[in-house]
């Protein structure tokens, strides 16, 4: 998905499926702008388990292998703007298309542009980068500056190409301040504009930090964030580094690897968060999310069927989509039906946890008293069964009485209220070690 304004400040929302390209106007009218002759893509990712799949000599002759190193990814699109026009490239079709905002005319192939590409990104300097250009998974090709139909390098233009020194394949490109970040499934590279004669210089800025899916990365003012194959990474302009994540095992142990190409990252600037939608278990579609608050450095997880999205800015609210093609205005209202939203902490202990914590009182910090209830869960040993205390209806202060070496707190809304809770305090003392 992509949202943008034209030169008259009219709002545009563009979305794509594995075989279609759509424009949705502010009145919710949907226009099919799919290019003529588009090669239909793959709805789902799949392993090549047919005859000839996998490694030579691994299985019996004439039988389909039980596993394979060959993966056919679900089709995704690269969408970007060229001035006020739309540029689009399907990872399956590989051609670069331009749509000039005429709802009566579909997107058309850009003349002279390379084909068999895996994606595109428009740089800050107004070059179009074709990623995996011409079917070469490591090649970046670019057009002349301000001219997306001139791709053959000459002494009179700035078109060119470069093959990354990498063992991986290019997955995505992200426009950043003063540079363009190019992520492969193995490492990270930066392209920096230098002018003639080389036009762009390329530098590796990270290894063992490959991108999990073509839509699994997002760039914001603070830097770039992406989901890898077994961790999360960020690039702040100098070097790529892994982000400490307390829920990493929870996410990756349950991620459906056969549909990992559907992982989608969105920025929620209203709350300084990066969300990743991903398919869990045996689900073919994204049904869960993991989110990072990049200012406070904490993580959250949950269940939500969203496949793509755009941040607020062009539109008042973020707009996210589900697998059925429904569009949602996110961050609107706070009714939640029978489901009660909650926040839950990790384990709290005194020092290194040798002493028992005796808790006698809770001092709440609510926006409006009475809109939340609090439950405590305690353990005496890390592998012990948890004991539950509460739920407590909060007063100021709230008397409680329990003990344990490890204590967790759960704050849960009691109704359809716009509740907010700050930093609560507990009155506790250290007991013995037994």
For the regions a protein language model found, what residue spans apply to each?
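Conserved loop/turn motif of beta-propeller repeat scaffolds
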Residues: 9-10, 83, 125, 177
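Beta-propeller and closely related beta-pinwheel folds
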Residues: 37, 41, 59-72, 103-262, ...
